[in-house]
Amino acid sequence: MKRAILLTWDVEEYDAPADFGARPLPDGGLSRGVAIWRQWLEISARWKIPGTVFVTARLAEAAPDLLRETGQRGHEVASHAWSHEPNVDLQLAKSRGRITELAGAAVVGFRSPRLRLVPLQEVRSAGYRYDASSNPAIVPGRYWRIAQKRKPHLDSGIWEVPASVIPLIRFPLFWASFHLLPLPLYLAACRLLMAWDGLLTLYFHPWELSELREKEIPFWIRRRSKARRIERMNTLISCLGEYGEFRTVRDYLGV
């Protein structure tokens, strides 16, 4: 079986600077989030690969045309809860229903904002078939989850699809590592994991490929220009495509 690459994106209100201490934008980052999403569709068009897009219902309501275009491009549309505000009701069922209505396609996947832990029974009861909120690693200042399983598995009648981590040391290959590591080293780690598991699950945010002027955003993210960050992502996708096949999460699980 050909190795699978699950490239996933969290499409949300632009509140990343606020996460790092900046003053929240007046509209919670809604208008900037729409602009970044539109720009991401332009950037990703050249890749010609399917991915999985977890979008908040609030952003989907603000840009239903972009939501439909995302699905028409061959991407799976999934739920990222109702909004990206911290510590609020995720409205699991309501967000799934609203995104389904706006997208005109069934929504079966869920990822919580900031990978917040949500009981899988609640996710399943809301009508989802899989949850992608697990990053089974140590992320300083965020969480310690090395006891969680590393590969997709059924739990409480629902699929759990963890983000990829290096075995044994549990080093995460999530979005931050992409910016922190030299690209050849990051690619080598991805290839190692594909050889080991036959699967690579990555997640990023469209805002990572946008103009980042806010001084509160850490230097390790904004040290490269927007053009350079896009170029690195283009290179990553091109190189990974030589080792595996890009698929949506739903297609991979067969749900």
Predicted regions and their residues:
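Catalytic alpha-helical scaffold of carbohydrate-active enzymes acting on polysaccharides/glycoconjugates
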Residues: 1-162, 166-168, 185-255
